[in-house]
């Protein structure tokens, strides 16, 4: 959750919300929009060594997949980190190509005429599926998650073995809220390693608008128990129905996400 104090500290008091959530100085800054990446599918790619869990195609790099029948937290995190490194590099490169081409063939002259000559350019990256990934990693860490494979050895489903419900994002529980916050920081650090078009400043949002439905439709079963094709929680929200401790606990979980990242 953003506060006026956070916004003023970051960009000053002469600000407006551009696009959906980005605070920017009016007339002094602009944004190269960047949509978002599907972090939940990235986790599944990490488990399957870059193969798509729905089509079986080799989409990501052919890293070593998880081979055990039970997901090990440290093993999954190491593979997930490698896959996020690849994703961040691919994401920034794609954004640079898009906005170079956009400026070349459809430069927004009228809107730029209303800005200062020397402006701050930002490039807006984003994450979708944060609560799905946080809950999945929480289940792997605090319960036992069994892998179910198809006849080709592809991990296509998961079974959680637990005496109770593993910690779930949205309930003011440090065990899972910390995982979510660390993911935001970690992915942003990876994004910042890669230079941007026109030296734009890297920014990141945990925003989906309505793409949480579309992204979920294209994502298979996840280790948190979410079913294939099911929508993600919108934006930085908990997954549907998992915030069982009231709205304040849900807000406190979201507020743990670092605004500076």
Show the residue positions of the predicted features.
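Conserved catalytic cores of very large enzyme subunits
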Residues: 1-261
